[in-house]
C-alpha cells in the first residue's frame, strides 16, 4: 500500500457502528459538528482517524450502517483506498441501511442478464418488496444454472439475503461480485467499480440532503 503525507482539508466518507461509537473502546460517540482529534504520529491501519474519499472504498471498512460525511484535517496520510488524519469532523450522519439495501439490489440488477434469474428474484430486486425477500432467496439458492455466471448469481443471491445480515456488509460484498461479473478484464472491472461508486455516492448524498 502506497502512502504519502499531506496537510490539507479533505472531504471523505466514514461508516460507523449502528450506535455511532468509535472502535477501540475509546468511548466517543460521533455527532455532527464535532471535531475529533488524536495525537501523532499517525499510521494507516494502526493509529489515527480514518475515512475514504470514495464511498465504495469506505464501505469495505464499514462496522455498521451509519454513514458520515466528514472532513479530515491536520496531518493526513493517503493510502490506496483510505486516509488517516489527526482531525476528523462529521458534517452529517445518517442511517444508511435502506439506502445500502437499495444499492445492493441495484448492483445485482446490473448483471441479472448474465444468468437465468427466477422471476421472483427479478421482482424482488426491482421492487424491494420485503414480502418477496424470503422466496427470492430460496429461488436463487435452488437455481439450477448458477454455474453459468457465478458472480452474477451471487450478486443477486446476496441482495436477497435476510435482514439479519448487515446492509453495509451485503452492499460491500455484492457490489464487488457485480463489478467482477460485468467485467472482462481488470480495466473493465475498475470502470464498473467506479460506476458503482458514482451510484452509491448519489444515493448517499440524497440521503444526507433528506435528513
Language model features by range: what are they?
Residues 1-211:
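Short, glycine-biased loop/turn motifs at secondary-structure junctions and
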Amino acid at each position: 500500500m502506497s502512502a504519502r503525507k499531506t496537510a490539507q482539508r479533505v472531504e471523505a466518507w466514514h461508516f460507523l457502528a449502528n450506535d455511532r461509537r468509535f472502535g477501540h473502546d475509546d468511548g466517543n460517540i460521533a455527532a455532527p459538528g464535532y471535531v475529533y482529534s488524536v495525537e501523532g504520529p499517525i499510521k494507516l491501519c494502526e493509529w489515527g482517524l480514518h475515512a475514504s474519499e470514495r464511498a465504495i472504498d469506505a464501505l469495505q471498512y464499514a462496522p455498521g450502517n451509519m454513514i458520515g460525511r466528514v472532513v479530515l484535517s491536520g496531518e493526513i496520510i493517503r493510502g490506496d483506498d483510505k486516509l488517516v488524519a489527526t482531525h476528523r469532523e462529521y458534517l452529517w450522519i445518517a442511517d444508511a441501511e435502506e439506502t445500502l439495501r437499495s444499492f445492493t439490489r441495484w448492483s445485482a440488477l446490473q448483471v441479472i442478464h448474465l444468468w437465468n434469474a427466477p422471476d421472483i428474484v427479478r421482482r424482488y430486486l426491482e421492487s424491494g418488496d420485503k414480502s418477496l425477500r424470503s422466496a427470492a432467496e430460496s429461488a436463487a439458492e435452488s437455481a439450477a444454472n448458477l454455474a453459468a455466471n457465478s458472480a452474477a448469481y451471487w450478486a443477486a443471491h446476496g441482495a436477497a439475503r435476510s435482514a439479519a445480515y448487515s446492509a453495509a456488509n451485503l452492499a460491500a460484498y455484492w457490489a464487488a461480485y457485480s463489478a467482477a461479473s460485468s467485467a472482462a478484464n481488470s480495466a473493465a472491472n475498475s470502470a464498473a467499480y467506479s460506476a458503482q461508486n458514482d451510484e452509491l455516492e448519489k444515493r448517499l448524498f440524497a440521503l444526507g440532503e433528506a435528513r
